[in-house]
Amino acid sequence: MIQILGKTNIDFLGKKYIALALSCIMIILGIFAIFQIHAGKANLGVDFAGGLSLQIRFSQPVTLAEVRTVLDKAGIKDADIQELPTEKKILIKLKKQQEGIQDTIEKALKENLTAKEPIIESVTEIGPKIGERTKRDALFAILAATAGILIYIAIRFKFHFSIGATVATFHDVMAVLGIFYILDKEINLIFISALLTIAGYSLTDTVVVFDRIRENLGKVAKGTMTLEALMNKSINEVLSRTIVTSLTTLMAAVALFFFGGEVLHDFALAMILGILVGTYSSIFVASPVVLLLGKNSLIKR
């Protein structure tokens, strides 16, 4: 493992109350965002808000930028454009079903991309009921992932460790959701996929710290060290590894943000935020929660 830091002795848990206060603010912000989403006051994508979906086939490859330019000229600026598995097909999603919008899109594409022979293959209306069901399914997916984390950590470690990991994961998901709400970013299925990916990343980061804590618990002689001191020691020991892992993953997410195209832009942004928040929570949220649930007494074996 690459070492970018020497031996450190930082009192991370000495700052636990400040960190937990900051984390509570982020969680509250995320919960507020959930209520706003439920009330339909957030920037919801077509999958959640309902709208119109058009699948268009071309005779030649077409870029999203070309289609975006054509739609902008036609006054359609809020369309969500996605590439399909074949480079000759695209998907256009619109939140609002304006009268004659399908004809407007077809006319604009045929006039500006005549050589590529655009043809609307299918049109799907996404009604409010489908949007509500999608919201419920997305919430269920997040809750199921959280429950899985709780069970996995409880089996691998101890129950209070599972609470710490679950709180840290919940914290990360709520923080990213809250930030996206503040930035007025679109909440869609791609974003939900990012949240589930963040949950998995957060768990991996936390398990690295917990694994070192468990390892050190087996090495420390009875009555020679408090649990807080042992946790600080463990976090410092894996700090370099945590930073290297986070930076490596972050570089990939940043590259995706700048070069991944329009469709993956918000996914990459969510991942960048999730990596930063997840690294923070594995140090300042998961371990302090475990410490607060247990007793900061001399270790007994």
UniProtKB/Swiss-Prot annotation:
Keyword Plastid: no
GO molecular-function term, one example from the UniProt record: protein-transporting ATPase activity
Family matches, as InterPro entries: SecD/SecF_arch_bac, SecD/SecF_bac, SecD/SecF_CS, SecD_SecF_C, SecD_SecF_C_bact, SecF_bac
GO BP terms: intracellular protein transmembrane transport; protein targeting; protein transport; protein transport by the Sec complex
A Pfam family: SecD_SecF_C
This protein's record includes keyword Cytoplasm: no
Keywords, sorted A to Z: Cell inner membrane, Cell membrane, Membrane, Protein transport, Translocation, Transmembrane, Transmembrane helix, Transport
Membrane topology: Multi-pass membrane protein
GO (cellular component) term, any one: plasma membrane
TM region positions: 17-37, 137-157, 163-183, 190-210, 239-261, 272-292
Cellular location(s): Cell inner membrane
Main localization (coarse): membrane
Complexes and interactors: Forms a complex with SecD. Part of the essential Sec protein translocation apparatus which comprises SecA, SecYEG and auxiliary proteins SecDF. Other proteins may also be involved.
Function as written in the Swiss-Prot or TrEMBL entry: Part of the Sec protein translocase complex. Interacts with the SecYEG preprotein conducting channel. SecDF uses the proton motive force (PMF) to complete protein translocation after the ATP-dependent function of SecA.
HAMAP family linked to this entry: SecF_B
Entry similarity comment: Belongs to the SecD/SecF family. SecF subfamily.
Stated name of the protein: Protein translocase subunit SecF
Organism of derivation: Thermodesulfovibrio yellowstonii (strain ATCC 51303 / DSM 11347 / YP87)
Gene symbol of the encoding locus: secF
